[in-house]
Design a protein with these regions (language model features):
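Acidic (Asp/Glu)-rich catalytic clusters
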Residues: 72-76, 100-108, 128-139, 171-175
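Core AdoMet radical
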Residues: 51-66, 70, 74-94, 109-122, ...
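Hydrophobic faces of well-ordered beta-strands that scaffold small-molecule active sites
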Residues: 23-27, 80-85, 113-115, 140-144, ...
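Auxiliary Fe-S-binding modules of radical SAM enzymes
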Residues: 2-12, 18-23, 210, 218-309
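Conserved C-terminal portion of the radical SAM core fold
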Residues: 164-223, 239-262
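Structural recognition of alpha->loop->beta junctions
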Residues: 45, 104-110, 198-212, 281-297
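Distinct, well-ordered alpha-helical segments
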Residues: 94-102, 123-134, 154-157, 196
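N-terminal [4Fe-4S]-dependent radical SAM core
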Residues: 1-81
């Protein structure tokens, strides 16, 4: 594969800027979700099974222990980003967040902080806290789970917020100089390529620094799993994902960094689509598609030109 020559990928971007490989280490901060505990809603998003975020052992380790454990598993990197991934990693009092984030960045060889959260859980005090780390020289990314820009779909999947909420949070973050990475799902019920391209267009118009693309995973324990088991919902086919994600990449400005272009999961948690068991399947097909049809930005006549590392 030669994805770095076809897509402005986060790994390549980090290597160019830091002069060496930088690896993300995922953390479980013990946070909850306001869309489950009644603060915003109950039941959670219809695609979500929170147990899939982290293994049980990870949940019971300290931040320092989690980072040390994961760093030992990474052979090719000596610099790391601390990534608070599970649940809603800004859903706590600011003093609790400060303690968590500080524990992470104070560990050896941590050069940055990535915080995954919902657009409706990022008050000004949290943005200001993240800015403190940015101003100290850390690489800081606010990762917002948007999934889609279509309010009808957001309601259908029980997200508990609308696209306007995402726009407000993104604009406030970027006004402070924070980098925003938006998570988008391809294959949501009722959406096809046209809707996904519309989502991309609206995200780019709002302003964004990075994007994560993710095929819809139907996972055990989710509300969607019940629809799948009843035959009312199908997982997205690899061919359809490749076509839609490929066109989204081709319609993305070259300066936007792709943090991820596919995602995998394992059985028994994963019910469908089973091609997502293979972490390389989506990337191999996208590599082929983009080689045939054009690189990131080519549909805008602004093709991605790889920079010398």
């Amino acid at each position: 594969m030669q994805l770095q020559k076809l897509v402005n990928m986060f790994g390549g971007d980090l290597t160019r800027r830091y002069g060496q490989k930088v690896h993300k280490l995922t953390l479980h901060g013990g946070f909850s979700c306001p869309n489950r505990d009644g603060t915003i809603g109950r039941g959670g998003c219809t695609f979500c099974n929170v147990a899939s975020f982290a293994d049980e052992a990870q949940q019971h380790r300290s931040i320092a222990e989690q980072l040390a454990h994961q760093a030992n598993l990474v052979n090719r990197a000596k610099r790391y980003l601390a990534y608070f991934q599970a649940y809603t990693s800004t859903f706590a009092e600011v003093q609790v967040l400060r303690s968590m984030y500080q524990q992470a960045v104070s560990q050896a060889n941590i050069v940055g902080l990535c915080v995954g959260t919902r657009p409706d859980c990022v008050p000004d005090v949290v943005l200001d806290l993240l800015c403190e780390y940015k101003d100290q020289g850390y690489e800081v990314w606010l990762e917002l789970g948007l999934q889609t820009a279509h309010d009808k779909t957001l309601h259908r999947i029980n997200r508990g917020h609308d696209f306007a909420c995402y726009q407000r949070t993104t604009q406030l973050a970027r006004q402070r100089g924070l980098k925003v990475c938006s998570h988008l799902i391809v294959g949501l019920p009722g959406e096809g390529q046209a809707e996904c391209l519309q989502t991309l267009e609206r995200v780019v118009e709002t302003g964004v620094d990075g994007i994560k693309l993710h095929p819809l995973h139907i996972v055990k324990g989710s509300i969607m799993a019940k629809a799948w088991e009843a035959g009312r919902l199908n997982g997205i086919e690899l061919e359809d994902y490749t076509l839609t994600a490929g066109e989204m990449i081709r319609h993305t400005p070259p300066e936007v960094i792709y943090h991820r272009i596919s995602a995998s999961a394992r059985r028994p948690t994963l019910l469908a689509p089973l091609w997502c068991e293979n972490r390389w399947a989506g990337m191999v097909e996208l590599d082929r598609y983009l080689n045939e049809h054009g690189v990131q930005g080519s549909a805008l006549e602004r093709p991605w030109i790889p920079l010398t590392e």
